[in-house]
């Protein structure tokens, strides 16, 4: 018999939510006095995973409630309004075992729609739960609720969850998701003793809507057409900004976050990059990093002094704490990879790795120095899999035979929107994604329709088997991290230039246990071939995980087994998300030009509302 574990996180709601049990109708929100009243909780200690968590193959149900609200927070010393889940910044850690069913009740207390995506989880058989507005669902309306329910099948490792509505992820709606398994190649107690999460994000002092609106103007954001690098780097929710640059008298310098690790142990550090833009390089003074996982795949990897990590990627590394003594402290340094951050500034986020034991915990800052062989400011950006061999510990050679190959040409340039206006943006195959947010593509295919349109680049794998996805990054010198939903892929080939279908047979592919990932860094002017198994019917997003590029249209879809999708049925609550909405309305994006198109649910559900054009005042002066 399946057990049930219910985990309810309590928070201060900023709007009152009237439940369906009380009224018999869909929940509605009361927006009276809608200013933030709570101060978000920032507690880096929650990222130390407990050894008391039972890793078992007996499935259970793990139930959570997520209240999405606004709050005030000063994660880097500068106070701003943030979005939070259960008043936590970052949001709560989800921890489960392979085979468990995860249920998450999401209550949206914001003034705009929301959704939650479970980054890296395949959603095998539950495509309706992938959490992408306009692709797999309609957004959760303001003041309403939706329950995500799915079983974690045949996966373990390091994942995360985040909002997939516009780029509101960058405002604080994200958190770790850890899946254990007694059959995982990496075993606690054998391969490592302790488990810690290192959750890394960039942090901008303006709300994401302000940034998106500014980028749509000729002046750009702070005078630049490029997305922001970030005002600070946050590690487990804390960072240090340049208070002088903010012009705010209330700005403070909070202490760096601490990661406590026992002495004489092997500690697994799970690095998660939730950043909206930069690639980061992570290093720990005096501690080599043994790479043992990438994107949920346990690997035999190198031992390095520095790990490059792209937006959306995850890496686990093991460090040895037997060389020091209780009380020793070392700097963990996270720096921006300037080789792919044009016009960027040298920026380092710091955390303290401190050895603990049975005595008093020291509060002294480390006196350690960085490794002498770290990447320089002009070092080109490259994924760790490009520089080193990452061999999956569970060996799985790529299928020799494949049914189809499809090409996505990734481009930046001029596109034409549905109103006939030309705009600068990103896209695939000469199409910049324009999101009909109340007409999900999954629903269209379920009804027997097609994703082929001028609104989104798409490709279809009709049958069970294996196939190739070729991505040509034609964006000149601009690198991108690409994330594929619903699938893990095997990286079987890379090269410079562009690869056509005609030249595919001339490539010597690596089919012998290639690395398996779901997020991949692809340099400008290069190509990659991904081998996938087409066993998961659904409409799956393929997009750049630089959130600002996504709002500019850097998204395509991969349709797998459309015939099988026609026999799938989502829950009634999923269908009801689209009730009383306009299927022709477009969701928020950097280049959405017409504020007149709205959902018919105008009283509470204004996706293209006036906030896109309003001025939001900062609490401090802009940088010069």
UniProtKB/Swiss-Prot annotation:
State the UniProt keywords alphabetically: Cell wall, Copper, Disulfide bond, Glycoprotein, Metal-binding, Oxidoreductase, Repeat, Secreted, Signal
Annotated catalysed reactions: 4 hydroquinone + O2 = 4 benzosemiquinone + 2 H2O
Task: Give any Gene Ontology cellular component.
Answer: extracellular region
Q: Which positions in this protein are listed as binding Cu cation 2?
A: 119, 162, 545
Q: Where in the cell is it found?
A: Secreted; Secreted, Cell wall
Which prosthetic group or cofactor does it need?
Cu cation
Query: Which residues are involved in binding Cu cation 4?
Result: 480, 544, 549
The record's family statement is:
Belongs to the multicopper oxidase family.
Q: What is the purpose of this protein?
A: Laccase that catalyzes the oxidation of certain aromatic compounds, including L-dopa, to quinones, which then polymerize to melanin. Able to oxidize a wide variety of aromatic diphenol and diamino groups in the ortho, meta, and para positions but not monophenolic groups such as in phenol, tyramine, or tyrosine. Plays an important role in virulence. Plays a role in dissemination to extrapulmonary sites but is not involved in pulmonary growth or in elicitation of cellular immune responses in the lung.
Spell out the protein name for this chain.
Answer: Laccase-1
What would be the name of the gene that encodes this protein? LAC1
């Amino acid at each position: 018999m399946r057990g049930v574990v219910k985990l309810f996180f309590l928070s201060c709601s900023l709007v009152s939510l009237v439940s369906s049990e009380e009224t018999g109708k869909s929940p509605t929100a009361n927006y009276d006095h809608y200013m933030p009243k709570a101060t978000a909780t920032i507690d880096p200690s929650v990222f130390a995973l407990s050894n008391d968590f039972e890793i078992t193959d007996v499935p259970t149900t793990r139930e959570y409630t997520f209240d999405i609200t606004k709050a005030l927070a000063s994660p880097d010393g500068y106070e701003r309004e943030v979005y939070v889940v259960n008043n936590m910044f970052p949001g709560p850690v989800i921890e489960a075992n392979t085979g468990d069913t995860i249920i998450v009740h999401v209550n949206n207390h914001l003034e705009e729609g929301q959704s939650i995506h479970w980054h890296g989880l395949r959603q095998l058989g539950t495509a309706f739960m992938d959490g992408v507005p306009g692709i797999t669902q309609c957004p959760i309306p303001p003041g309403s609720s939706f329950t995500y329910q799915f079983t974690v099948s045949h996966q373990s490792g390091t994942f995360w969850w985040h909002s997939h509505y516009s780029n509101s992820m960058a405002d604080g709606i994200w958190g770790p998701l850890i899946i254990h398994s007694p059959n995982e190649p990496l075993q606690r107690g054998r391969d490592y003793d302790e488990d810690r999460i290192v959750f890394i994000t960039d942090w901008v002092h303006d709300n994401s809507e302000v940034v998106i609106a500014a980028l749509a103007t000729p002046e750009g954001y702070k005078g630049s057409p490029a997305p922001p690098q970030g005002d600070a780097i946050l590690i487990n929710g804390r960072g240090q900004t340049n208070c002088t640059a903010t012009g705010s008298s209330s700005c403070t310098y909070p202490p760096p976050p601490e990661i406590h690790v026992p002495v004489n142990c092997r500690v697994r550090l799970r690095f998660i990059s939730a950043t909206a833009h930069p690639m980061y390089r992570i290093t720990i003074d005096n501690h080599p990093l043994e790479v043992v996982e990438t994107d949920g795949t346990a690997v035999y990897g190198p031992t390095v002094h520095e790990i490059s990590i792209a937006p959306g990627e995850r890496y686990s590394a093991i460090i040895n704490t037997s060389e020091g003594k209780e009380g020793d402290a070392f700097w963990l340094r996270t720096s921006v990879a300037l080789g792919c951050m044009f016009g960027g500034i040298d920026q380092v986020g710091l955390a303290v790795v401190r050895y603990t034991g049975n005595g008093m915990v020291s509060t002294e800052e480390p006196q350690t120095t960085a490794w002498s062989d770290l990447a320089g400011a002009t070092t080109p950006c490259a994924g760790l899999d490009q520089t080193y061999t990452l061999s999956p510990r569970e060996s799985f050679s790529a299928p020799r035979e494949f049914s189809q190959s499809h090409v996505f040409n990734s481009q930046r340039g001029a596109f034409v929107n549905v109103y006939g206006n030309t705009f600068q943006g990103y896209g695939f195959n000469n199409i910049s994604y324009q999101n009909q947010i109340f007409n999900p593509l999954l629903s269209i295919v379920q009804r027997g329709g097609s994703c082929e349109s001028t609104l989104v680049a798409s490709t279809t794998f009709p049958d069970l088997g294996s196939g190739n996805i070729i991505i040509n990054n034609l964006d000149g010198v601009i690198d991108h991290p690409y994330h594929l939903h619903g699938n893990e892929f095997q990286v079987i080939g890379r090269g410079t230039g562009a690869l056509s279908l005609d030249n595919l047979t001339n490539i010597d592919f690596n089919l012998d246990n290639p690395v398996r990932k779901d997020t991949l860094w692809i340099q400008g002017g290069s190509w990659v071939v991904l081998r996938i198994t087409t066993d998961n019917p659904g409409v799956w997003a393929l997009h750049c995980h630089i959130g600002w590029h996504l709002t500019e249209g850097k998204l395509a879809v991969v349709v797998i087994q459309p015939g099988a999708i026609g026999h799938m049925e989502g829950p009634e609550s999923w269908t009801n998300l689209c009730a009383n909405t306009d299927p022709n309305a477009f969701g928020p994006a950097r280049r959405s030009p017409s504020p007149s198109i709205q959902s018919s649910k105008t009283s509470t559900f204004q996706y293209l509302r006036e906030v896109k054009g309003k001025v939001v005042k900062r609490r401090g002066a802009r940088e010069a």
